[in-house]
Amino acid sequence: AEYLHPDDFISGFETFLAVSKNENLKGPAVILSGILPHPEILRLLDRQGVRVVDDDLLNCNRRMPMSRGLAQGPYEILVENYFAMPPCPTRGSPIQERIDFMMDKVHKNDVQGVIFCGIKFCEPEWFDVPQMVAAAKDAGLKTLLLDLEVNQPLSGQLATRVEAFVEMIS
């Protein structure tokens, strides 16, 4: 929705709602964390019956302020919104805040697994992954790490890894 004209987004969203209204919601639930993966990966998850019930993606939920402020001026609003954003490694958030934020999503959504998507050479996004994976595993969750390249299409190897992960959480 970020780059679409509102008319295009609204019609696409209405189509999505109409198509998915009567869908069976029994597939395994996952959270995506990191960088939004290529659409082919998302389509593969959809074909496998996976439900992405929440996200901790840099360009999705991590950009949404967690609380609405009371500031009036444009600069105050900008500052308030920046500091109201969810924890993010690109802003130097403490790792425990990120873990708590993710685990809160896990508990609210009855999640079976977490998929961590990172782009090669995007170090800030990878800084917290070892501790976040450990926290997810301690909670009994399965994890999948996808080390991707910008605009990397779905390869056979990547598809096999995703399919194996889906089998583990199903």
Predicted features and spans:
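A charged, amphipathic alpha-helical module
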Residues: A1-S67
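Flexible internal linker/loop segments at domain or repeat junctions
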Residues: R47-E97
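Peripheral docking tails and interdomain loops at the edges
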Residues: P130-S170
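Acidic beta-strand-to-loop metal/phosphate-binding motif
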Residues: Q112-K120
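Gly/Ser/Thr-rich loops at beta-strand to alpha-helix junctions
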Residues: I31-P39, K120-F127, P153
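A short, acidic, amphipathic alpha-helical segment used as a generic capping/interface helix at domain edges
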Residues: S93-D110, F127-D128
